[in-house]
């Protein structure tokens, strides 16, 4: 309902602050242009509770990325204040923020996902790793401090960099096409195929504007149905709600591997969720409207 007061939460203090500011501005501009009573609130600092109590919004569009928006704290706060919001619940956000926990749940349910474990000083010192592997922070997004590692020397450097962001995981490297699917509750959108600027879809590839996106992805009808079903099952298994995105690798044998679930996807010009929706004929404004009107 357009007479509801909406707060767009963006910014914050995570390493993904700049991306979040861009997402928040795009969403806020869209809502205002559609006639919504919307204001933006930078979640940086310690005044968020006071701001929300002052504004008394009916709904919050969560455009925070990284720990600020995806570790469950904001969801818990909004639920405590009885404010409907566009992201997953506190419990689900905690799970999806931690890639290892998410992976363990998916593997328990026999969902296809690459093998992984925590990377430790002891493991780095061992010489029994089969390269290449992926090394990344267990928590975090935008592929910050994510590396394709091909040797023990590279492993040491990757571990040192990734450990700046918390616990580190080492994951089986899967070669193939990078595919993603956006979901808003029961609406599963078209898959998008990403041709990254670099060897894989790292931070630079995501935000340089030089990667190539195919939306729709060009999968055959059977494979498109399969990847959408896998995306929705993963979304449900991890208890997601609202707007989320599921990322895959599609290998040359026709297998999909779930890489991660993002509970607060980007909404910038280069972001994947709007491209997924656009492939279904849903433009950016309509997509924003669908997300906010389904806030829970």
Curated annotation (Swiss-Prot):
Keywords of this entry? ATP-binding, Cell shape, Cell wall biogenesis/degradation, Cytoplasm, Ligase, Magnesium, Manganese, Metal-binding, Nucleotide-binding, Peptidoglycan synthesis
Q: How is the cofactor bound?
A: Binds 2 magnesium or manganese ions per subunit.
The ATP-grasp domain, residue ranges: 103-293
Q: Name one GO molecular function term.
A: ATP binding
Q: Which cofactor does it need?
A: Mg(2+); Mn(2+)
Matches recorded under InterPro entries: ATP-grasp (IPR011761), ATP_grasp_subdomain_1 (IPR013815), D-Ala_lig_Van_CS (IPR000291), D_ala_D_ala (IPR005905), Dala_Dala_lig_C (IPR011095), PreATP-grasp_dom_sf (IPR016185)
Record field: catalytic activity: 2 D-alanine + ATP = D-alanyl-D-alanine + ADP + phosphate + H(+)
Chain residues that bind Mg(2+) 2: 260, 262
User: Where, by residue number, does Mg(2+) 1 bind?
Assistant: 247, 260
Where in or outside the cell it occurs: the entry states:
Cytoplasm
Q: Known Pfam families for this protein?
A: Dala_Dala_lig_C
User: This protein's superkingdom?
Assistant: Bacteria
Protein's pathway: Cell wall biogenesis; peptidoglycan biosynthesis
The record's listing under NCBIfam families reads: D_ala_D_alaTIGR, PRK01372.1, PRK14569.1
Family the UniProt entry places it in = Belongs to the D-alanine--D-alanine ligase family.
**Per its record, how is this protein called by name?**
D-alanine--D-alanine ligase
Organism in which the protein naturally occurs: Francisella tularensis subsp. tularensis (strain SCHU S4 / Schu 4)
Q: What's the gene? A: ddl
């Amino acid at each position: 309902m357009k007479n509801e007061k909406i707060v767009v939460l963006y910014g914050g203090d995570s390493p993904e602050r700049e991306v979040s500011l861009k997402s928040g501005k795009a969403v806020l501009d869209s809502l205002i242009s559609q006639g919504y009573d919307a204001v933006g609130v930078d979640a940086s600092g310690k005044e968020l509770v006071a701001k929300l109590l002052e504004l008394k919004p009916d709904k919050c569009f969560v455009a925070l990325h990284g720990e600020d928006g995806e570790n469950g704290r904001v969801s818990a706060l909004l639920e405590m204040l009885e404010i409907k919001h566009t992201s997953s619940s506190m419990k689900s956000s905690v799970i999806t923020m931690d890639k290892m926990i998410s992976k363990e749940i998916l593997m328990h349910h026999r969902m296809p996902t690459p093998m992984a474990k925590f990377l430790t000083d002891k493991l780095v010192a061992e010489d029994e790793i089969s390269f290449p592997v992926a090394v990344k922070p267990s928590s975090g997004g935008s592929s910050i401090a994510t590396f394709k590692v091909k040797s023990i020397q590279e492993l040491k450097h990757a571990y040192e960099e990734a450990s700046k962001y918390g616990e580190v995981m080492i994951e089986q490297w899967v070669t193939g096409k990078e595919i993603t699917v956006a979901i808003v509750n029961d609406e599963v959108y078209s898959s998008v195929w990403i041709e990254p600027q670099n060897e894989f879809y790292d931070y630079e590839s995501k935000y340089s504007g030089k990667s190539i996106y195919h939306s729709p992805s060009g999968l055959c009808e059977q494979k498109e149905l399969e990847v959408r079903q896998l995306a929705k099952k993963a979304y449900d298994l991890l208890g997601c709600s609202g707007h989320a995105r599921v990322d895959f690798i599609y290998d040359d044998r026709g297998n999909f591997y779930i890489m991660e679930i993002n509970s607060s996807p980007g909404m910038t010009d280069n972001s994947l969720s709007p491209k997924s929706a656009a492939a279904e004929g849903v433009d950016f404004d309509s997509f924003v409207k669908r997300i906010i009107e389904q806030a829970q």
